[in-house]
Amino acid sequence: MAEISATAYAVQVDDLTLAYRQKPVLWDVDVRIPEGVIEAIIGPNGAGKSTLLKAIMGLLPLASGEVRVFGRPFSKERRRVAYVPQRSAVDWDFPTTVFDVVLMGSYGSLGWILRPGKREKARAREAIEEVGMGAFLDRQISELSGGQQQRVFLARALVQDADLYFMDEPFQGVDAATEQAIVTLLKTLKGRGKTLLVVHHDLQTVAEYFDRVLLLNVRVIAEGAVVSAFTEEYVQRAYGGRISSTLFPRGNKEDVHDARAHASVL
């Protein structure tokens, strides 16, 4: 596999370890995500998938390791990153409208002193239309379905016009129409040169939705192009041998980072 310079990686993680009450949650994690790809993080419950996103964004203290975004510390590139959290992490009863939630996405570029102007408000309306929620502009978010709520948060991320998007289980609990809308949005963002890192749980759609995959179970099991890394061997190792063998495309291992090359594997 051809070498890629550090500055060509959207995300580079080296030797990251994170513990909670002295129990490792992530252990000796290395990640390399090239720019302009859609990469899934998959693994069983408790594997550390959401934790890895938060660790990269500096939301959790590291026991050791280094994180770089576009070749620099995350704190230096924070404004180039957008985050879509799990729906369960959001207080949907907060009294605010669809438009106001999406408009919040502009605060990162404006700061907390400047107020959104005509340009920002027009972009918020455009993003709401882009995710198919134009008819719900003034609707309270508490009145929306789960799929509609997810679309609103995707619109807020669009307003940020980030270069790197972190999405934590965006497909969880949504209807089929919303799922396809999310897939279309991911591919649209990729077409604009954006990079997307998505925590994902449905193994049946990995090969269809993503370019690359990171298999995680406290440690990195493998990372690379879907055709190379999403194989029966690596997935069974990540999930403890509990997965049907009918899921996997036949590929090669030329473009895959195998954790066994430099560390012990679960």
UniProtKB/Swiss-Prot annotation:
Boundaries of every ABC transporter domain copy: 11-243
Binding of ATP, residues: G43, P44, N45, G46, A47, G48, K49, S50
Keywords: ATP-binding, Ion transport, Nucleotide-binding, Transport, Zinc, Zinc transport
GO MF terms held by the record: ATP binding; ATP hydrolysis activity
Domain of life: Bacteria
Signal peptide: none
GO BP annotations listed: zinc ion transport
Pfam families: ABC_tran (PF00005)
Gene3D superfamilies: P-loop containing nucleotide triphosphate hydrolases
Annotated family: Belongs to the ABC transporter superfamily.
Protein purpose: Part of an ATP-driven transport system TroABCD for zinc.
Protein's name in the database: Zinc transport system ATP-binding protein TroB
Gene encoding the protein: troB
